[in-house]
Amino acid sequence: MTLQQQIIKALGAKPQINAEEEIRRSIDFLKSYLQTYPFIKSLVLGISGGQDSTLAGKLCQMAINELRLETGNESLQFIAVRMPYGVQADEQDCQDAIAFIQPDRVLTVNIKGAVLASEQALREAGIELSDFVRGNEKARERMKAQYSIAGMTSGVVVGTDHAAEAITGFFTKYGDGGTDINPLYRLNKRQGKQLLTALGCPEHLYKKAPTADLEDDRPSLPDEVALGVTYDNIDDYLEGKNVPEQVARTIENWYLKTEHKRRPPITVFDDFWKK
């Protein structure tokens, strides 16, 4: 089995999907989890205005709507959390995503004060954060806020991780990667677009250039620039297609060096790192 085949198998990626079937699969997955653990009353998700959180948010709200109707349990809710760092450049996209999702509840937590306070505390301890590490601080502060909200609403935190993100480890460890449940896991980027198209999402929310937008020195840096490959390249690779040798090397290098991000903390029983 080639490394490409191993990666595809590990991430559960498929070369083709039926959008309606995958929508149903994600909704039923969320509903089943909530029904298995009836003490869970809320799904909590950060909404950025980008493709992934818009899709995950829509699926969460659809799952909650169906479950309330089927069970009569009105205590169930989907909580969308806006977490800007100061003023977000694409705030209108966030509002458009909220309008599309129609969440039961919307909370706004501006993380800038908390991030700056943490940075100052570290500075006083003799640690000066780089811009890149400050970006990770933002991602972790957002996750901290979501877990606090989930803790106060008997909820779980929903993630937006998918195959095209998992393969490159393009997420912050214990930041946006530290979630309870990931309904998009298995899909690549273009397949996510297919689901949003089927759901009637406004095109500008999934046709814009994806960005983590974590770095102050490089605001709105496109993911594809940071990664050195395009999402079309990544999706082709995940679909088992032949890609240029340099593209394959870049993708596989990202996959191998970020393996620790896709695993629990390493223990004496692990040996995947002995390479």
UniProtKB/Swiss-Prot annotation:
InterPro entries: NAD/GMP_synthase (IPR022310), NAD_synthase (IPR003694), NH(3)-dep_NAD(+)_synth (IPR022926), Rossmann-like_a/b/a_fold (IPR014729). It holds the Pfam family NAD_synthase. One of its GO terms (cellular component) is cytoplasm. The keyword Magnesium applies. Disulfide bonds: none annotated. Deamido-NAD(+) binds at R140, K173, D180, H260, K261. One of its GO terms (biological process) is NAD biosynthetic process. Catalyzes the ATP-dependent amidation of deamido-NAD to form NAD. Uses ammonia as a nitrogen source. This is NH(3)-dependent NAD(+) synthetase. It comes from Escherichia coli O8 (strain IAI1). The gene is nadE.
